[in-house]
UniProtKB/Swiss-Prot annotation:
One GO biological process term: NAD biosynthetic process via the salvage pathway
The enzyme's E.C. designation: 6.3.4.21
The protein, known as: Nicotinate phosphoribosyltransferase
Chemical reaction(s) catalysed: nicotinate + 5-phospho-alpha-D-ribose 1-diphosphate + ATP + H2O = nicotinate beta-D-ribonucleotide + ADP + phosphate + diphosphate
Task performed by this protein: Catalyzes the synthesis of beta-nicotinate D-ribonucleotide from nicotinate and 5-phospho-D-ribose 1-phosphate at the expense of ATP.
Annotated transmembrane regions: none
GO molecular function, one term: nicotinate phosphoribosyltransferase activity
Organism whose genome encodes this protein: Methanosarcina acetivorans (strain ATCC 35395 / DSM 2834 / JCM 12185 / C2A)
Protein family per UniProt: Belongs to the NAPRTase family.
First-tier enzyme category under EC: ligase
Gene behind this protein: pncB
Amino acid sequence: MIKSILDNDLYKFTMQMAVLELFPKAEAEYRFTNRGSHHFSEEFVEKLRRVIDEDISALMLTEDEYQWLGENCSFLKPMYLEYLKNFRFKPGEVEVCLTEEKELDIRIKGPWHSTILWEIVLMAAVSELYFTTIEKEWNGKEWDGNISATSESILTAYGEKILEIGKILEENGCLFAEFGTRRRRSFELHDQVMKTLLQIETLTGTSNVFFAKKYGLKPIGTVGHEWIMGTSALIGLRYANRFAFENWVEVYKGDLGIALTDTFGSEAFFKDMDLKLSKIYDGFRHDSGDPFTFVDRVIDHYRKMGIDPMKKVIVFSDALNAEAAIRLKKYCQDKINCSFGIGTSLTNNSEFFRESPPLNMVIKLHSVNGIPVVKLSDSPEKETGERDALRVANYIVGRKGLDE
């Protein structure tokens, strides 16, 4: 299910290193949110607990993985690699239960640098367990997770679907990376996706470090919302974007230069993205809101700064499929460079699995040092955080009045 400590997204490791360097004593809490209508069971909770206690807790960096990171991820410092070599997941940091309403409740508490790696592995485990214990029928066939004729036929058919998607992206010149670990249907299906995508020339890499190593691909990723969210608790929300991205430069010296724009809404972001930061960062990542409006806003920002947009890039990562990527590629043509991070559409495709759609879930940072944090986003349905904290945050960034 989770095969390696590297079976995780690159940006969890890069953020872990930054937290260790700048905020080593910070305490964090994360919480799970089920945005969909899927239901869970006591049996599911017991199996998830077992995966946490027995499987994930046993993961450790191998010598081979340690050497590979040193050779292929030069931005990870030797001191951090030594830390990771000794890192072990602590099951006691994770609480799992069903509420009285039969909703799945997951809470992760502990040092920020320690708890930061749980998010992706837990989401991948939740998704795979759901589709092997609750919704076992995949397109009318029961998946058993073993090497059987039924499982092989599903994998083969899914590979054909992914190859079709990849060829469409390739024919339209769309540079893209695979971003689908967190909501994948199963590890085996994810592996099939990666094997298939090796045939596609416009594949730039994968966010999953394990598969990057296995298939000789570039690990892709920079920073997530939690870096900015955590900064807001430790330094203050009003200037969180600026401090977060200046601190990122301090740690990575220009490496990993894609800035995430929507943590507190893109307008607040662009106010903080001054000339220095706009020059240092290679581009911006779009993760919510209208992407076409965003393209125009980014181009306008660069032009006002006297920067040629054709020397910068937008990375699109908001619930993308091939059709959306192609439309955006055409819109950006001769205006600004673009690439795409495509996730669930590759690792749990809803067109292929028509009768059992992927889970709509997130695990987000809830507080740092006991201070609630929020994500405002450019899409209202993606807001996360306590109601009062959201109200104050929207007021501070100028989006709403205190009583709205």
